[in-house]
Regions:
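Hydrophobic residues in well-ordered beta-strands that form the structural core
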Residues: 53, 69, 92-93, 118-120, ...
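C-terminal helix-rich "cap/oligomerization" subdomain common to oxidoreductases
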Residues: 66-68, 310-385
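Contiguous beta-strand/loop segments that form the cofactor/metal-binding neighborhood of enzyme cores
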Residues: 179, 183-280, 285-295, 302, ...
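N-terminal Rossmann-like dinucleotide-binding module
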Residues: 1-47
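Aromatic/hydrophobic pocket-lining residues that form π-stacking "cages" and hydrophobic walls in ligand
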Residues: 40, 79, 107, 133, ...
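Predominantly a Rossmann-like dinucleotide-binding segment in NAD(P)-dependent oxidoreductases
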Residues: 124-210, 227, 236, 380
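Rossmann-fold dehydrogenase core element
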Residues: 104-124, 144-148
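Beta-loop-alpha module in the N-terminal Rossmann-like domain of NAD(P)-dependent dehydrogenases
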Residues: 17, 50-110
Length: 385
């Protein structure tokens, strides 16, 4: 079976969708649409796709199996609804699902009524150490998670130069809440499932960029009592484009994940596991992760920060898992979307251990949480989700 695909929006990510999906033998990119015709020709001609400047006739003429929506953050609703109206059975959407809850609800409602399926590309679920984090928390290897932090920051070049002369207009329609915290919120919902965010308190500021907030800094409370701080800014003068780190504190262990390292940091991942685990159980979990394509080292060692003070190491050895500089896979989630369509399931064989793939329901939940973050920052109060 060969799946017919149409791609709407050919900016930075839209172009990548075309080349990545066209590289799969089960996929044929039959149409591409962008308001800039020259760009559509540049992207579409090399893969033999028909070029359009209007996605409505493209969807009607091509009748694709999959429509990819890679338009700017606030412009997802209309192409998604058009794809559903044209009878497209599967829609791959870039995150965030929407910048308003009303848009997300409208898309999900239309999909459910039509029997269409929406997939939302939360790419930060796909890399090996993303999946290792999910494994450790879902298997209770840290005990109950009680607190955590996520810092996801961009260089100031992103809101000032990334999209060329269109940058300001693009950024005015989004923010670090939608552009960055959509990643953080979804990642936390995924690893903490089935727990859900129930309330939010947030702040923001506009001191550097006047046309969009400089940052959002929020506290999320989950229904199991866990609390997380999530912070995202895009006014940093850093060496790289992105810095991304996550911390999880459990009742029995802790996890640190430097996904995209900053100055004087190393990209890596360490989980100090519950003291109840012995070395046999440690090796079992290491083997299970290896079988899933996640290479982590196993340590069974004394960890006592007071050893130099009291001149002795207390307690029994501690089980830990760690990894450094593991290659990322930013397209694993999208590839699993294709597998899901082929296998007609939300849990295809390529995503067997990580729960259902992110769908329109996840998109709505993420949009609700981010919407609460924005509302809380504007009103200066706790907002229930």
């Amino acid at each position: 079976m060969v799946l017919k695909v149409c791609v709407i929006g050919l900016g930075i990510l839209g172009k990548q969708y075309v080349t990545r999906l066209d590289g799969r033998p089960e996929v044929n990119v039959v149409g591409v649409a962008d308001v800039i015709e020259a760009r559509a020709r540049e992207v579409g001609h090399p893969v033999g796709a028909k070029v359009y400047t209007d996605y409505v006739p493209m969807l009607r003429e091509q009748r694709p199996d999959i429509a990819v929506i890679a338009t700017p953050d606030p412009l997802h609703r209309e192409p998604v609804l058009a794809a559903i109206e044209a009878g497209t059975p599967a829609i791959f959407q870039e995150k965030p699902m929407a910048t308003t809850v009303a848009d997300a609800e409208a898309m999900l409602d239309a999909a459910e009524k039509a029997g269409a399926r929406i997939f939302v590309n939360y790419a930060n679920r796909g890399s090996p150490l993303d999946r290792a984090t999910h494994y450790v928390i879902q298997h209770g290897l840290l005990g109950q998670i009680v607190y955590g932090e996520s810092h996801l920051d961009d260089h100031i070049a992103v809101p000032t130069r990334l999209w060329g002369n269109r940058t300001r207009s693009w950024v005015e329609g989004s923010s670090t809440a939608h552009f960055l915290l959509s990643h953080s919120v979804d990642f936390l919902r995924w690893v903490m499932a089935p727990a859900e965010v129930t309330e939010v308190f947030a702040i923001s500021q506009r001191k550097v960029l006047t046309y969009t907030p400089d940052l959002y800094d929020a506290f999320l409370t989950f229904d199991n009592g866990a609390k997380f701080r999530v912070k995202a800014e895009w006014i940093k003068h850093i060496d790289g484009l992105v810095e991304f780190s996550l911390d999880f504190s459990g009742a029995e262990g802790s996890l640190r994940y430097n996904k995209v390292a900053g100055f004087a940091e190393v990209e890596g991942w360490r989980a100090n596991l519950s003291a109840t685990l012995d070395y046999r159980e440690l090796l079992k979990h290491q083997g299970a992760l290896a079988a899933q394509g996640v290479p982590v080292g196993a340590l069974y060692h004394h960890v006592d920060p007071l050893a130099d003070v009291v001149e002795r190491a207390a307690g029994k050895p501690r089980a830990s898992l760690e990894a450094f500089n593991v290659a990322k896979d930013g397209w694993r989630v999208v590839n699993s979307f294709v597998d899901a369509v082929l296998e007609e399931t939300l849990t295809p064989s390529s995503w067997a251990h990580y729960g259902p793939l992110p769908s329109g329901i996840d998109g709505l939940r993420q949009t609700q949480v981010v919407g609460a973050i924005v509302e809380s920052s504007e009103q200066g109060r706790v907002v229930e989700v």
